[in-house]
A protein has these predicted regions:
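Short, acidic/polar
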Residues: 61-78, 161-181, 235-248, 292, ...
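Low-complexity, acidic Ser/Thr/Pro-rich repeat tracts that form intrinsically disordered stalk/linker regions
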Residues: 35-49
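Extracellular low-complexity, Gly/Ser/Thr-rich intrinsically disordered linkers
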Residues: 62, 348-415
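Secretory targeting and sorting signals
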Residues: 1-38
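Substrate-binding surface in catalytic domains of secreted glycosidases
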Residues: 95, 99-117, 195-345
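Conserved, mostly hydrophobic/aromatic
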Residues: 84, 147, 190, 217, ...
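Active-site groove signature of glycoside hydrolases
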Residues: 172-204, 262
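Glycan-recognition patch characteristic of GH18 chitinases/ENGases
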Residues: 45-178
């Protein structure tokens, strides 16, 4: 199964022109600021600003990647996490639906695969990832789990959902709060890629659609559940942040996860090489606003409180091949070979396959042979944590848990 959250960027170049034509200059109209109303999100009590550590767990990782909920425990990651976002549920016919029901609720775990060392039985009412998450929460009572819906591949259904936000919210609530697993989940994460803009498909629901949908979700889930959302990091004028009313919708979320990674990559097959998750700008950066500081500054400038913004980090790298120049900005012949697909690989692989030998824009890069990769390391994450703290951000989130080493090198660098 494809990894729908992370793999949105290869299509960016293909859809950019079409997106502009479809959406036009109206993206900037009515550029609101954050406001409040009766359905606003309550102050989150379970984690103080700056302390949230949110990691995505991919449903399909239990197959080819052989990454299970038990690995969250054995790597030490569970001791660092405050929240897990379970990715992904689907959006179909205007409703929240299951992603892979077998992986989520039916896959049987042996004793050695299980979080608590107890094997599943054939007749128990719940198996799969959900039951393993239940066991993980029993070991870590303060750990919260949210069910994330959408992602790169499954966001097309949000267009239909936006036509009747209340019905969508009801369907999500009914699914998340199903009596078989209601105790597993503490809320919902909306990952719409992208409202009134283009991802794998183009949405033309209008600038207000996102605020209306998030209002309905908060109204249905109420103040006792968490409501969060992954949002774009494109801070350019007329870009994806301008396309929807993220400021107006901020009142309905406990926090936003701006996806400050995948800024650059081998979807531009010939280069120029550039780090996919720069913290800051640097001389020669291909697009001026494509870095985390620009994203955070733009969102704060819209009036979104700092403590409702988390800093995003990728536990993976992006790379090119056919590169002779060590420094960023070189030409390439195409994407570098990755373990599962071209142009991308996990940190746990890259740290030995192509060790970092340079830094730029607050992140690391590596030139080995004719391959050029960029990724974060424990050292560059430490620098990003300094920035997060200086800005008073609400914490850190990352994509995704299986990219880290077996002993959790990257998550241990997050404070």
């Amino acid at each position: 199964m494809p990894r729908p959250h992370r793999l949105r960027a290869p299509f960016r170049a293909l859809v950019a022109t079409a997106c502009t034509a479809v959406l036009g200059a109206g993206l900037l109209a009515g550029a609101g600021t954050a406001t409040a109303d009766q359905n606003a999100a309550p102050k989150a009590a379970e984690a103080q600003a700056g302390s949230r550590v949110v990691g995505y767990f991919t449903e399909w990782g239990v197959y080819g990647r052989n990454y299970h909920v038990k690995n969250v425990e054995t790597s030490g990651s569970a001791n660092k996490l405050t929240h897990i976002n379970y990715a992904f549920g689907n959006v179909q016919g205007g409703k929240c639906t299951m992603g892979d029901a077998y992986a989520a609720t039916d896959k049987a775990y042996s004793a050695d695969q299980s979080v608590d060392g107890v094997a599943d039985t054939w007749d128990q009412p719940l198996r799969g990832n959900f039951n393993q998450l239940r066991k993980l929460k029993k070991k870590h009572p303060n750990l919260k789990v949210l069910w994330s819906f959408g992602g790169w591949t499954w966001s097309g259904g949000f267009t239909e959902a936006a036509k009747n936000p209340q019905a969508f919210a009801q369907s999500c609530y009914d699914l998340v709060e199903n009596s078989k697993w209601a105790d597993v989940f503490d809320g919902i994460d909306i990952d719409w890629e992208y409202p009134n803009a283009c991802g794998l498909s183009c949405d033309t629901s209008g600038r207000a659609a996102y605020k209306n949908l998030m209002s309905a979700v908060r109204a249905k889930f109420g103040s006792n559940n968490l409501v969060t959302a992954a949002i774009p990091a494109d801070a350019s004028s007329g870009g994806k942040i301008d396309a929807a009313d993220y400021a107006g919708a901020a009142q309905y979320v406990d926090w936003y996860n701006p996806m400050t990674y995948d800024f650059f990559g081998a979807w531009d097959a010939k280069g120029p090489t550039a780090p996919h998750s720069p913290l800051s700008s640097y001389t020669g950066i291909p697009k001026a606003e494509y870095h985390s500081q620009a994203t955070i500054a733009k969102l704060k400038g819209l009036g979104i409180p700092s403590d409702k913004l988390l800093l995003g980090i990728g536990f993976y790298g992006r790379g090119w091949t056919g590169v002779t120049q060590k420094a960023p900005g070189g030409t390439a012949t195409g994407p570098a070979q990755g373990t599962y697909e071209q142009g991308i690989d996990d940190y746990k692989v890259l740290k030995t396959k192509c060790p970092a030998n340079g830094t730029v824009g607050g992140t690391a890069y590596a030139h080995c042979g004719t391959n050029w990769w960029s990724y974060d390391t424990p050292a560059t994450i430490a620098g990003k944590m300094n920035y997060k703290n200086q800005q008073g951000l609400g914490g850190t989130f990352f994509w995704e848990l299986s990219g880290d080493t077996t002993n959790g090198e990257l998550i241990k660098a997050i404070n």
